[in-house]
Amino acid sequence: VNVVAGVDLGGTAINYTIVNEQEQFLIEGLCEHPALSIQGPEVCLAQIEDGLKIAVELAGVSFDDIVAVGLDTPGPASSSGVLSARGSTNFVHADWSGFDIRKSLEARLSRPVTYLNDGNAGALWGHFTIFGANSRETSVSAVIGTGLGGGVIVEGNVVKGRMGFGGELGHVLVPYQSIAGIDGLHPKCNCGRTGDLESLCSLTAIALTLLPYFLPRYPDHELAKFDSSKAAKFVRGMAEKGDPLCRDVFRVQAHALGLFFDEMVNTFDPDALIIGGGAIETGVDFQRWFIAETRRGMPRQRTEQADIPIHIMPNGDTAGARGAAIEALKFTRAR
């Protein structure tokens, strides 16, 4: 039996999945192993291999059944898997700088390895859940977490770009001045831009920008007693329960996302828009409210595009590994 493995290498943990040729995932939920990436590439690659042996056992297959491996990591990295000298958190060991993780893992496992960054892997998973692995459709995914990740899939293929920065959707500027109720707000992103999507639609945006802006309007609010980075973690749950301040925060996030999606509709004319990430890992009622607010934030669409579907990405924790596996499955089919 031929299977493909997906390996989602995070800063502290590696998440695995196994998929067969029928596009069935053989591991339900999370299969995690410590990454130890802080100790450098050699230790981390050994961890990836050790965890893979545990994953195949859990999936009920053997290591020899693996015909290809899909890997994803946080960026910045080239489209072929060479990690940037400006490594992300936990990839700070000197040996990671300029390290070709795809080629090195391929040599270690003696199998072809494909590479995506974690945002693009999540986007491919979201696309697959709607259209399957052999699709020719186009979709745009926004993944709302600590930052704003995501990706663009054009005619079934991930847009990686010349240097691997395709789909860095968080740093696309949006005309936020048109959002109601935020006069005088100047949302700044850690990248140096003012008014990109991440500066308004992320956990970081809640802590740095939106809570400090809205809290003075609610002087007796229970979140006022926390510092904003701690308070930010309560906003989603309170918004889901209907708290007016927290709904205001999520309304601004949804309207910013709507402005961004409008730009994507005009650029790609996609078949679907997809929202993922921890921000909307909520009950269905709140997800429906958030989608409706996102549509409300979009400028009026052409009649032909007005009914573009907006989906919620399922299986948030496993999205990276599953997207990476789909990329490797597509590779094996193209050979």
What are these regions (language model features)?
Residues 3-50, 84-88, 164:
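Short glycine-rich, Thr/Ser-proximal phosphate-binding strand/loop in the N-terminal lobe
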Residues 4-8, 65-70, 139-143, 149, ...:
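Short glycine-aspartate micro-motif
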Residues 13-14, 264, 270-294:
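Glycine-rich phosphate-binding loops at beta-strand->alpha-helix junctions
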Residues 36-49, 65-69, 75-138, 183, ...:
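Glycine-rich phosphate-binding loop and adjoining helix at the ATP-binding site
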Residues 48-69, 112-113, 261-273:
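Phosphate/pyrophosphate-binding loops at sites that engage ATP/ADP/AMP, CoA/4′-phosphopantetheine
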Residues 131-200:
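Glycine-rich phosphate-binding loop of actin/hexokinase-like ATP-binding domains
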Residues 193-272, 306-308:
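A mobile "lid/hinge" subdomain adjacent to the ATP/sugar-phosphate binding pocket shared
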Residues 294-311, 321:
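Charged, glycine-enriched surface loops/patches
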